């Protein structure tokens, strides 16, 4: 029921919110353990300022304006390497196709809490070609109209770094192929 086409920036924002809260908790734990409150506040404030800056950068990458330089892609990967703790089973509540992809790469739910990367290209983000591979490649036996299209490696790739790292515009190779395939069909 909750599966819709939506902007996943909201999901990413929530992960940043978790890290923000973790910075608050770490500060309170340090102070409760006898650390200098002013120094601890400085650490927390610096961490939270970095989180604000990192999220603003990720959000800007999501808009898909100008060309995304190598340095920007490297920064996305650096930001994405931060971790957070997931306390709920990620197998629960999934639609059948998504659950099938997840079970193919992770038949057993990992022990909880599970450490997750802030931004990730996970195996279950990739939708492989199956029997629905369109007959538009030059040498495909069912290509009756002589199309010569290059199929991307996957039918769809929902990887977060893969999508945020699009160099120009907002379409992945998979998205662009799907549009062109609809045109020729």
List the model feature ranges, each with a label.
Residues 1-185:
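Histidine- and acidic-residue-rich, metal-dependent catalytic cores
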């Amino acid at each position: 029921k909750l599966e819709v086409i939506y902007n996943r920036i909201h999901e990413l924002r929530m992960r940043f919110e978790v890290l923000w809260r973790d910075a608050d908790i770490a500060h309170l734990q340090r102070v409760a353990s006898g650390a200098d409150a002013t120094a601890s506040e400085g650490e927390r404030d610096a961490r939270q300022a970095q989180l604000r800056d990192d999220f603003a950068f990720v959000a800007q990458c999501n808009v898909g304006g100008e060309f995304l330089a190598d340095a920007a892609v490297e920064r996305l990967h650096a930001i994405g390497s931060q971790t957070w703790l997931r306390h709920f089973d990620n197998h629960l509540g999934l639609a059948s196709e998504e659950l099938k992809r997840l079970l193919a790469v992770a038949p057993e739910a990992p022990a909880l809490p599970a450490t997750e990367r802030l931004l990730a290209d996970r195996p279950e983000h990739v939708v492989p070609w199956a029997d629905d591979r369109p007959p538009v490649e030059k040498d495909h036996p069912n290509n009756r109209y002589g199309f010569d299209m290059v199929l991307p490696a996957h039918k769809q790739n929902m990887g977060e770094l893969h999508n945020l790292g699009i160099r120009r515009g907002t379409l992945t190779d998979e998205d662009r192929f799907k549009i062109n395939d609809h045109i020729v069909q």
